[in-house]
């Protein structure tokens, strides 16, 4: 009896086949739970590898679960390779907690690029936020020296962009310069997903279409929502992957669509917690992903990108 073909390989879609290596929680939406479903709604075949499997995210009083190590990741990749299943158009990575696991992911990227040289690697370099690291310091060096050169698109927040470039971002010009520094190191697309300057929240995006050329840069002013949510960075990076692949020459349009989805989802989440009688400012909130399917598929763009000259 012959093995039937994998239809996502035999009949590839016009979107792509994504390998997403991120965390997983049984309850709630962070990591792969935030990324896989939206990408599937946008038409992608997504194969998740769960770097951890926890009962819930670590913001709860307790959590239980397992952590995947580098050898176990290699075992999964070897299983795919043995069955000729290693052709992917995209790899997506998020939170990674150890140098050894990150080094193994780099080996995986190189192996996948040997199968598909046009592989797009989208990396959310999750290291910390608001001036605080929540990964070991040695990971910063690995991201800067090894990961950034391999990435096709990078989606740091303000703090992470500062750690990767050594540049303090105190103005829009600093944000644009940080993007240029990152372009010089590797990725053609950089989106600093959240920057706070003078109390104003914005996103700065940059697309260098050819090495040596001046990048096309833009900003989107973002409405602050008075609450803290989990899983939003994972969702944002997945949406940027999804829309930037559909609009490869218009990163600003991709960012508009991603931001619009996220804003609508966060407003719904906030409203639903209020309807349930819960004070949404008292702790981090689980996002209403399933209830926001239409906003993922067909976002209404309310916040427009403004291109820098």
UniProtKB/Swiss-Prot annotation:
Q: Which residues take part in binding pyridoxal 5'-phosphate? A: 58, 233-234
Named cofactor requirement(s): Zn(2+)
Give the modified residues of type N-acetylthreonine.
2
Tissue specificity annotation: Expressed ubiquitously in leaves, stems, roots, flowers and siliques. Present in root hairs and other tip-growing cells such as papillar cells on the top of stigma.
Gene3D superfamilies from the entry? Answer: 3.40.1190.20
EC? 2.7.1.35
What taxonomic classification does the UniProt entry list for its organism? Eukaryota, Viridiplantae, Streptophyta, Embryophyta, Tracheophyta
Gene that specifies this protein: PK
Where ATP binds, per the record, is at: 124, 157-160, 193-194, 225-227, 232
Pfam families, alphabetically? Phos_pyr_kin (PF08543)
Activity vs pH = Optimum pH is 6.0. Active from pH 4.5 to 10.5.
Which amino acids does the record list as binding Mg(2+)? 129
Q: Which organism is it from?
A: Arabidopsis thaliana (Mouse-ear cress)
**Keywords linked to the UniProt accession:** Acetylation, ATP-binding, Kinase, Magnesium, Metal-binding, Nucleotide-binding, Pyridoxal phosphate, Sodium, Transferase, Zinc
Q: Which CDD domains match?
A: pyridoxal_pyridoxamine_kinase
Q: Which reaction does it catalyse?
A: pyridoxal + ATP = pyridoxal 5'-phosphate + ADP + H(+)
Subunit structure, per the record?
A: Homodimer.
This protein's name: Pyridoxal kinase
Which SUPFAM superfamilies does this UniProt record tie to the protein?
Ribokinase-like
């Amino acid at each position: 009896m012959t093995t039937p073909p994998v239809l996502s390989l035999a009949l590839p879609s016009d979107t792509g086949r994504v390998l997403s290596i991120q965390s997983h929680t049984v309850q709630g939406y962070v990591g792969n739970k935030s990324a896989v479903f939206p990408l599937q709604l946008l038409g992608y075949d997504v194969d998740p590898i769960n770097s951890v499997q926890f009962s819930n995210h670590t913001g709860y009083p307790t959590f239980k679960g397992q952590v995947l190590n580098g050898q176990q990741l290699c075992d999964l990749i070897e299983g795919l390779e043995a069955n000729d299943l290693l052709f992917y158009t995209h790899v997506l990575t998020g939170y990674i907690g150890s140098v050894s696991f990150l080094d193994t992911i780099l080996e995986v990227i190189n192996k996948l690029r040997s199968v598909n040289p046009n592989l797009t690697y989208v990396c959310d370099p999750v290291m910390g936020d608001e001036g605080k690291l929540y990964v070991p310091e040695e990971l910063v060096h690995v991201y800067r020296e090894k990961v950034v050169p391999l990435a096709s698109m990078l989606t740091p927040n303000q703090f992470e962009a500062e750690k990767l470039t050594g540049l303090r971002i105190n103005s829009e010009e600093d944000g644009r310069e940080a993007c240029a520094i990152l372009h010089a190191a590797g990725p053609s697309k950089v989106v600093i997903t959240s920057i706070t300057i003078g109390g104003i929240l914005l996103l700065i995006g940059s697309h260098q279409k050819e090495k040596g050329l001046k990048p096309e840069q833009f900003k989107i002013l973002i409405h602050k929502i008075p609450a803290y949510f989990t899983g939003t960075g994972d969702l944002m990076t997945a949406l940027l992957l999804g829309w930037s692949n559909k609009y490869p020459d218009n990163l600003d349009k991709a960012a508009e669509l991603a931001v619009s989805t996220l804003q609508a989802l966060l407003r719904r989440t906030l409203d639903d917690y209020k309807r349930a009688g819960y004070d949404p400012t008292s702790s981090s909130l689980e996002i209403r992903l399933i209830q926001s399917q239409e906003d993922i598929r067909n976002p209404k763009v309310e916040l427009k990108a403004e291109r820098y000259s």
